[in-house]
Design a protein with these regions (language model features):
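Sec-dependent signal peptide recognition
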Residues: 2-9
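A short beta-strand-turn-helix
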Residues: 36-55, 84
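Thiol-based oxidoreductase modules, predominantly thioredoxin-like and allied folds used
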Residues: 35-37, 77-109
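N-terminal "domain-start" segment that seeds a small globular fold
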Residues: 21-44
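Short active-site neighborhood of thiol/selenol oxidoreductases, capturing the structured segment around
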Residues: 51-65, 90
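Detector for the c-type heme attachment site
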Residues: 68-72
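Non-catalytic, surface beta->alpha helical segment in thiol-disulfide oxidoreductase systems
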Residues: 116-171
Length: 187
């Protein structure tokens, strides 16, 4: 009797581990589409543009249950993962990290101080950027949209689409855009 129960327990542990997101040495969740850069935002924006992608910064912290939710329940969905990989140049910032970040305005600070400068209070927070950002503004000022917190697959996917479609330029709020898309997706 013990053998079938033990085998079942091992299979369940393997199945649960399949859905666990990778964790880096810094304690943050990692995704294959994240870029390891020098965190110079002007250079990152130029590289994103060269690849025909949009720059996206994701601020996270060690032990964040909402970051875990995004990395285990939302980002692994094939449609979302492919969309991010195809359309975004993603740079991860550690809310309490010490790696230097150079902002669009030229100021260089450790991640933890840059996050304070940007007044980002929650994780995950995702900042989205246009193809051009003035050199006299911070990332917080240059972002076309900010997504604070964890959201479900439909909201997240629709936000990514709204950014790529430049919905922020159309005058249609994200909420209205999302409501229309969500109605279609729910059919």
């Amino acid at each position: 009797m013990k053998t079938p129960i033990a085998a079942f327990a091992v299979l369940m542990a393997m199945a649960l581990n399949t859905f666990a997101a990778d964790i880096g040495d810094d304690g943050l969740h990692k995704a294959p589409w994240m870029r390891d850069t020098f965190k110079d935002l002007i250079e990152d924006l130029a590289e994103a543009n060269d690849e025909g992608k949009r720059l996206m910064i994701i601020i996270e912290q060690r032990g964040c249950i909402y970051c875990k939710k995004m990395h285990e329940d939302v980002f692994p969905i094939e449609k979302i993962a492919k969309y991010v990989e195809d359309n975004f140049f993603v740079v991860q910032i550690n809310m309490f990290g010490d790696v230097e970040v150079t902002d669009f305005d030229g100021e260089t600070l450790p991640e933890k101080d840059m996050v304070k400068k940007w007044r980002s209070l929650f994780t995950p927070t995702i900042l989205f950027f246009p193809r051009e950002v003035a050199d006299d503004v911070s990332a917080a000022q240059g972002a076309v949209a900010t997504m604070p917190g964890a959201f479900g697959p439909h909201t997240t996917f629709n936000m990514f689409n709204w950014i790529i479609e430049k919905g922020y330029e159309s005058g249609e709020s994200f909420q209205k855009y999302h409501a229309g898309k969500f109605a279609e997706q729910s059919k």
